Amino acid sequence: MVVCLTVSCAHNKTSLSIGPGVVSLSSPQDVIVEMTGETYDKLETILQQVSYVKLSAIPLLSRIKKIQIADERIYLWDLVVGIVCYDMSGELLFQLNARGQGPGEYTDINAFAVNASLHQLVIYDNMKQSLMFYSTEDGRFVKSEKFNKPTPAEIAYWGGYFFYHNRLHRNYQDDISLHYYLLASKDGITIGKRYFKHENNKEDYPFSPSGHNLYDNNSKLYYCRDFDNIVYQIHEDSVVPRFRINLPNPLPASMIEERPNEMSLLRSGYSLGITDIYEYGGLLFFRFVKDGYIWSCLYNVEESKQVYCAKRIKFLDSSLIDTIDGIYKDCFYSILTPEYLDYAFSENPLEDYPDLFKTYDVEGDNPVIAFYRAVVR
């Protein structure tokens, strides 16, 4: 989410068939952001809670890096326990945690994506410089393909293509064909298109303020580069600017060249790091960092007006929403972590919550996935 590459022995070789992808010159929709306060507590006028999925407590998750829901299955990448797959009732189906050098084993997970059409779960292992393919049915190892370069920070599969977010090129300085942020491949190995040439000032400053750059929006795939405010919609053969998010007091591009201290930058009065970009039902959700806080925003794209921009979002009474983490079918969804639920239970008595939560153990249970549908306006 370019010059062509083929795989030969241990080295990727450049083919002459790669070409630049088309970046549309159409004008994006402007999204004007204004801060509305500490808390927005009228969420029930915008979203309604639909259902909850309590994940099986074994294995116990601790550091969730990415979630993807596809074909009635929930895939979670946890930095400690690996990739875990659940059904839509929260029951464990399988766990990928085979670390090692043997067949079917990986040394580390650097990125992953689900190819639902081929029933494949794909892991990028930087140490092995390989793509590892597993079955989404039972986690069974299928194959390994050598993938020396690029070194993607993120993978998405959409519309029959693999899309790679390629942050840096320091490991292949001389191969300028790959000095691009977004690369596309039909088979996962051979790069077919490239978009957005690397900028030297960002190569020298590898800090990434955004949690992700590729966003699965159910029927659409969105992409936003680090330190950028343009959200692009990815198509099979082009990318189209969809939104221009105008943040208050945005970070000047010149500051990146100064390579400021990361924590000082996040605590500064500048706005940066647009992330978690999800649009459904005429509503666009996203987050960014300013003054050391993460701000959540909701924008009505049909009426071109902001709904809110606040540090916290909640329902008027008992609140069970932390942030928007994705879209599945006709719903937004949110990962309710034990830490968040512990806080929510301290704010409101347990009897205010659905029965599912009355026996919830914040010390020994896994997160709950909550689904929300846009209120018909």
Task: State the predicted function of each range.
Residues 62-66, 107-112, 150-159, 204-212, ...:
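Repeated scaffold domains used in trafficking and secretory/extracellular systems
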Residues 243-266, 302-329:
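Conserved blade-ending motifs and adjacent loop-strand segments that build the rim/top face
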Residues 14-52:
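Blade/loop signatures of beta-propeller domains
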Residues 32-34, 49-81:
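Beta-strand-rich domains and repeat architectures in extracellular enzymes and scaffolds
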Residues 55-65, 91-118, 125-126:
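Blade-loop segments of beta-propeller domains
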